[in-house]
Design a protein with these regions (language model features):
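PLD/PLD-like phosphodiesterase catalytic module centered on the HKD motif
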Residues: 2-44, 48-199
Length: 199
């Protein structure tokens, strides 16, 4: 019989967030079976993130791309992805997958916290989505083996999922020269190269 690991709250430094989350999720998936293919309810990673630039979104995306996370990911984002941000297309495609993802439209729901649910007993809860996780240290709850905590997190996720809107289709398209318009003023610069005589 395995020893239960109680949930614990830790203050995580800004620069350590992504690495600590990646290690936490990898440990659950690889060592403790944090996500079970045999359990229909646990056959998805449930993710709530402020944006695709949040450390939790980047951590999950990296583990999907490397093949550590092989089950579907259901994602709720508070902020629409900025298509010009570096790596946003790769992160979005990894964390949205076949579920399409949802977007928070009611700003009152920004009081919800970032979180992950893996299987029936593992979860993580971060700061509320009003605060940018890339600007501050934060208290975070790591629950690697607590079905009660994971159950509460799962219920919160499902309720939020049901009242959020699907991500717009255009956000799910790869960013290319055709889909991403040039910055303001670029058209004028091309039409009138530097050094052109003024009329």
């Amino acid at each position: 019989m395995s020893r239960k690991v109680a949930p614990f709250i830790d203050i995580v430094r800004l620069e350590d967030k992504e690495a600590k989350l990646t290690a936490f999720i990898r440990t659950l998936v690889e060592q403790t079976g944090g996500v079970s293919d045999a359990d229909p309810k646990g056959n998805a990673v449930l993710l709530i993130a402020r944006s695709t630039e949040s450390p939790v979104a980047k951590a999950v995306a990296a583990l999907v791309r490397e093949g550590t996370i092989r089950v579907p990911v259901k994602t709720i984002l508070a902020l629409a992805p900025r298509q010009e941000a570096e790596g946003v297309s790769e992160t979005l495609s990894a964390i949205v997958g076949t579920h399409g993802g949802r977007l928070v439209r009611d700003v009152r729901l920004f009081d919800a916290h970032e979180q992950i649910v893996l299987g029936q007993a593992a979860s993580w809860t971060g700061d509320c989505m009003r605060r940018d996780p890339m600007k501050r240290d934060a208290f975070e709850c790591f629950a690697g083996d607590c079905s009660k905590t994971a159950g509460w997190a799962r219920t919160s996720f499902e309720r939020l999922w049901n009242i959020c809107e699907p991500l717009p289709e255009d956000l799910l398209q790869p960013v290319t020269a055709e889909t991403c318009p040039p910055p303001v003023g670029v058209e004028d610069a091309v039409a009138e190269p530097l050094g052109s005589p003024q009329v």
